[in-house]
Amino acid sequence: MKEIETLKEEYPLLNKLIATEEVFWVNPNMEKYETAIKDSPLSEENVKDAEERLKRFASYIAKVFPETKETKGIIESPLLKIPSMKQALEKNYEQPILGELLLKCDSHLPISGSIKARGGIYEVLKHAEQLALQHGMLTEEDDYSILDSDTCREFFATYSIAVGSTGNLGLSIGIMSAKLGFNVTVHMSADAKQWKKDLLRSKGVNVIEYEADYSKAVEEGRRQADADPSCYFVDDENSHDLFLGYAVAASRLQKQLEELKIVVDEEHPLFVYLPCGVGGGPGGVAFGLKLLYKDNVHCFFAEPTHSPCMLIGLMTGLHDKIAVQDIGIDNVTDADGLAVGRPSGFVGKTMEPFLSGNYTVSDEELYRLLKELADTENIYLEPSALAGMIGPVKVCKEDAYLQKQQLMEKVQKGTHIVWGTGGSMVPEDVMNGYYKTGEALTILEK
């Protein structure tokens, strides 16, 4: 790897990142959609295949998770207009937000209460389907609810699944795997919240805790799985299946926008702000949206100032060959879902030509935004889920991107969607603590 001093000369923004200041970065490597898609390792067919598989499993999901009965086994979340929060943001940051502001509430996804319910559950279902088909327990024409039987659970119990996680991915993989009957182990990093570990253990999941960070938990999970031929490892750093599970969100969002009579075209751009840890969730969602809306959707990743792994990987072009710790950033943040020091190389390289930009936000800001959203809209998210909330302010304030893309005239006819990635499963006492922190920081700021 190049010496840090050389990197700092080449990429002056690194100095601000090293000082853990908030930054806004416009991706110079973004290409027009038609150019970018030609070299993409994944295509629309891959996403459609994932969508069809989730439809096949819908009858099973509706049967074993009654909370999905209403949506007939489709795991989906609301898309809400948040006008009071928009007003508060404009007032607090003295910056008009041009266009409408909406919140995608993946915080309220059924089963595991976070965006990870998309990719994590999808990958487990795909693995279960492959095993069941191979062993003649299922055909693609069957009603998949037949998997809810003692025979199937006993069959899956002869196999195991492992994953490394800071929390939310572990919840979705753990809950889904245990429900099917698999033996499941979640390797959790030091920053994983206690309540997430407790919840998993209550579902019969084996939780192994590490003193080290996320990358170490993943490495250990991979090692355990490598030693056991019957163990399947969900690889958050490299998984195409996770990525595709997230990508399915796009066509669902398209339907919701249509229901709200919100147009997305050249004159009505769509801006989407996605909290980013290792990259799979935001990468998959952004990829899916690009397939649908092409150059009319503009996706931004949001990271904590102490864990800007994807930004550093993309900016330097080093991707997973560089970690935040290499340049003296500690990777310590209360945004546990985003506490990742080394980004996914697969996601970084796949998304590089599609991504509009990336910005960082401090933990203090996340808490203040958490309190503000609770006060204005009565919606409670976990700290990491608020990373997207400041995006519309940043894009409108630092208008370099809007100028570059000739969007200055169009933005007020556009729509901003903040992806709320988690929060509904946070225990009340923990959430009260978050709120109080936000309250104290708001008073301090004033």
From Swiss-Prot:
Q: Name one GO molecular function term.
A: D-serine ammonia-lyase activity
Q: What does the record give as the reaction this protein catalyses?
A: D-serine = pyruvate + NH4(+)
Q: Which cofactor does it need?
A: pyridoxal 5'-phosphate
- List N6-(pyridoxal phosphate)lysine occurrences by residue: K116
- Pfam families in the record: PALP (PF00291)
> EC number(s) of the enzyme?
4.3.1.18
GO biological process: one example:
D-serine catabolic process
State the superkingdom.
Answer: Bacteria
Kindly state which keywords UniProt assigns to this record, in alphabetical order. Lyase, Pyridoxal phosphate
Name the UniProt record assigns to this protein: Probable D-serine dehydratase
PANTHER family found in the cross-reference section: D-SERINE DEHYDRATASE, THREONINE DEHYDRATASE, MITOCHONDRIAL-RELATED
Under the heading InterPro entries, the entry gives: D_Ser_am_lyase, Ser/Thr_Dehydratase, Ser/Thr_deHydtase_PyrdxlP-BS, TrpB-like_PALP, TrpB-like_PALP_sf
Its gene is dsdA
